[in-house]
Amino acid sequence: MRVLAFEDSYDITAILAEGGVDLSGIELRQHWNTMDCFERIREFTPDVLLLDHYIPPTKGLDVLHGLLELIATGQIDRPGLILGISSSDEANDAMEYAGADASIVKFKLGEHEVWQ
């Protein structure tokens, strides 16, 4: 499984490992900012895209809006799962409302069913 994460504060590999996720078979790439985010998504073609709501310089919510436009016009392939990750329930709700498949508090990321 190919996982692309945009998260600026916490190491996603560490969060998943602490959550008991078996990382074998997972190719995880984390970016600590959203610069060139669409090119990174296009090049990596993730199965799972993790988007932090408050990441700079472009917030994850704005990245999601732009990504969905590019998908709609056929300019980029849609990841199998787009998952909003934030420490704020309100931010996660906003990500789902905008078109993310699901969202989760980032510290509970290891509990999500995608890792089963």
Language-model features, listed with the residues they occupy:
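Conserved acidic segment of CheY-like receiver
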Residues: 1-12, 16-20
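Short acidic, S/G/P-rich loop/turn micro-motifs used as interaction or catalytic elements
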Residues: 9-13, 54-59, 89-91
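Alpha-helical interaction/dimerization surfaces of two-component signaling modules
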Residues: 18-22, 40, 94, 98
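A generic structural motif
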Residues: 21-29
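Acidic, metal-coordinating helix/loop segments flanking the phosphotransfer/catalytic sites
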Residues: 30-48
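His-Asp phosphorelay/catalytic-motif detector in bacterial-type signaling
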Residues: 45-47, 72-81
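Alpha4 helix (beta4-alpha4-beta5 surface) of REC/receiver domains from two-component response regulators
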Residues: 62, 84-108, 112
